[in-house]
A protein has these predicted regions:
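Ferredoxin-type iron-sulfur electron-transfer modules in oxidoreductases and energy-metabolism complexes
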Residues: 1-19, 34-63, 186
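Residue-level detector of alpha-helix initiation sites
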Residues: 12, 75-76, 100, 204-206
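Phosphate-coordination loops involved in phosphoryl transfer and adenosine-cofactor binding
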Residues: 65-68, 136, 194-198, 219, ...
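Conserved hydrophobic helix-helix packing surfaces used for dimerization/oligomerization
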Residues: 69-71, 92, 198, 222, ...
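FAD-site-proximal beta/loop scaffold in flavoenzymes
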Residues: 174-196, 274-336
Length: 336
């Protein structure tokens, strides 16, 4: 238990972290020069599971501060912030637009990677600590909610959950889905009808998750289409390896040019990398047959709830500009 208490000083969800993190620290661990890297990934998972099993609670000597903080979004950032704020004695309320807490941990990471009972246990610990979580509450105006609720500060952490679009002809065909909605539908029980042949466009971890989930739904063919090669894909290599082991086919150096109106025939163009590693068209085309197409091209941020906050500046990618303490240009409004 003492080891778990040490981990909890910085990492409030070790049972989740011990499953979802790809542990990049282990390959560069300086312990390698002695015998081998510390298996911190496995340690976190073991201690986190043990804590959930035995009902351990983190220690805190903080007295009530009299400060009240609103957190907008119950994803990993919001839940982590709530934990640390409670450890300082602040009163904390999380307001979440969805029906359950977890954010992309629940709606973006498939259950085979992160069992929901593990996620639920970590959330329940926060509630036992005194964090209030209000679900099905979409905040439209952060400043107004701050004023009406009498909060001393607001932390906005809604995440990037709006799928990016693309200009592929027939993009809005009924058989074309975005990966976030697809994975969210799996979690909410509204499983989409995808057919036996499924194409996934993108090369990130979300694309791998969508392809592996499609296989679990019974797809005989799950085909990833990605414009670069394996070396340049944004997904972690082990994700691609596990996907291929489960029967997912990855079409490297390929991009979608068009599809028919029923999204059953997809025309792809073969690409090649130039001297700078950028994909260039070759003029060589091929076709794939698919019953549905899942787009996994990244996500954008919905920052509309900050439109009424004077002084808040947005970056070109839609994220919010903050100082070293994560405060925006509006006093008392933080973002991360």
């Amino acid at each position: 238990e003492e080891a778990w208490q040490v981990i909890m000083r910085d990492n409030p969800m070790p049972a989740i972290h011990g499953r979802a993190c790809y542990h990049p620290c282990e390959p560069v661990c300086n312990r390698q020069s002695v015998d081998g890297a510390v298996s911190i990934h496995a340690v976190e998972r073991f201690l986190g599971d043990r804590a959930n099993e035995l009902g351990w609670m983190p220690k805190s000597d903080a007295l009530p501060s009299g400060r009240k903080v609103l957190i907008i979004g119950a994803g990993p950032a919001g839940l982590s912030a709530a934990y640390h704020l409670r450890q300082f004695g602040h009163e904390v309320e999380i307001r979440e637009a969805g029906a359950e807490a977890g954010g992309m941990m629940r709606y973006g990471i498939p259950a085979y990677r992160l069992p929901r009972n593990i996620l639920d246990a970590e959330v329940q610990r926060l509630e036992k600590m005194g964090v209030k979580i209000t679900l099905n509450h979409k905040v439209e105006d952060a400043v107004k909610e701050k004023q009406q609720g009498g909060f001393d500060a607001v932390f906005v952490c809604v995440g990037a959950h709006i799928s990016k679009r693309t200009d592929i002809p027939a993009r809005d065909a009924s058989k074309v889905l975005d990966a976030v909605s697809f994975l969210r539908g799996m979690e909410s029980g509204e499983q989409p009808v995808i057919g036996r042949r499924v194409a996934i466009y993108g090369g990130g971890n979300t694309a791998m998750d969508a392809a592996r989930t499609a296989k679990r739904l019974g797809a005989t063919d799950a085909m990833i289409i990605y414009r670069r090669d394996r070396e340049h894909m944004p997904a972690h290599d082990f994700e691609a390896v596990e996907a291929e082991e489960e029967g997912v086919k990855i079409n490297w150096l390929s991009t979608i040019k068009e599809m028919d109106t029923d999204a059953t025939t997809i025309t792809i163009e073969r690409m090649e990398l130039d001297e700078n590693g950028r994909p260039q068209p070759t003029g060589v085309f091929d076709t794939l047959q698919a019953d549905s197409l899942i787009l996994a091209l990244g996500q954008d941020i919905d920052s509309n709830l900050l439109q009424g906050a004077s002084g808040v500046e947005l970056k070109p990618d839609g994220s919010v500009s903050v100082d070293a303490g994560f405060m925006t240009g509006h006093e008392g409004i933080f973002a991360g």
